[in-house]
Amino acid sequence: MIYLDNAATTMHKPQVVIDAVCGAMTSFGGPGRGSHQAALDASMAVFGARQAVSDLLDAWGAGSVSFALNATMALNIAIDGLLPAGGVAVTTAASHNSVLRPLNRARDERGCQVRVAAILPDGSLDWESYERALVGASLVVATHASNVTGDVYDIERMAAFARKAGALFVLDAAQTAGAWAFSASGIGADVVCFTGHKSLYGPQDTGGLCVRPGLDIAPLVEGGSGVHSFDERHPRFMPEALEAGTANAHGLAGLAAGCCWLAERGVADVQAHIEGLVTRFLDGVADIDGVQVLGGGSGQRCGIVAVNVGDADSGEIADRLAQGWGVCVRPGAHCAPLMHTALGTQQQGVVRFSFGAMNSQRDCDDALSALRDIACP
């Protein structure tokens, strides 16, 4: 198997992550739910995961990190808790449905206005469209990198424009956390949403949001918190404000291990490794007749390359890659409908190759060989 579907989830995890999860499952009690050793061990693991995430992403400290099931839930928490009824929200056509659908719900149920800044056919942001959309905005929710084409956007500039317009800025870092070197506390964002199961190499059902100190986000879910149990409503102090119920301590032990593994390697070095594979793949694709590369207009690309082979359906190409050569990729719309409208690929979709820290040059070359055999039989 040649696994090149890392943008969906990283399948090959570091052994330290596997060991951490297995160890937690045989020794942890309920985090924040007792004073016996099993409960204390679980509580320390959750705190350790907060610290590991904050250290790796250069956030605002362990207390700024609230956990959720994934980036989708984190984005729902941020949008629901920060966008006032009747407010104006801005996003871009590169956004995933984890942004678009919560915003559309706010439009339909709370009278909010949703403005979408255009993405050009080459995958780059239409800056004039973005600036026009910001007038009177309350909240901006933007993706750091397109999960379709891999285009990486100038988030510092986007956040600066939002701040000038008086809007809060929420960053969807699902595709970049752990794979692209950036400072969560230094890019101008108020909230950075991340997932654990992609480039942080943690288990599925881990993720969360890093919140700027002093920012009050209304809880999306209320319930048991382990503290202030006689209060009628959920605590409003971080990080407990955005968490309810028993934490996934087993998964968070794995997430912490993944973050520590990345810290030892260095995110900048991981990024350089992935960029090298992407460059190698793009160079190879350029020599294959009939293969079109989508996007790239932003000038920076994360570990994602989207292609199409002539007018063939992307699902057919992905099936042939998997069945004939064991190359695992993802076809279709990738839950980002407006990006496909911008690219003109609504019907065909795209074949998405996505590289990670565990991939090698041989993986890249074998995938190119398979693609060449399909395109040029």
Where is each model-derived feature located?
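Pyridoxal 5′-phosphate
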Residues: 1-377
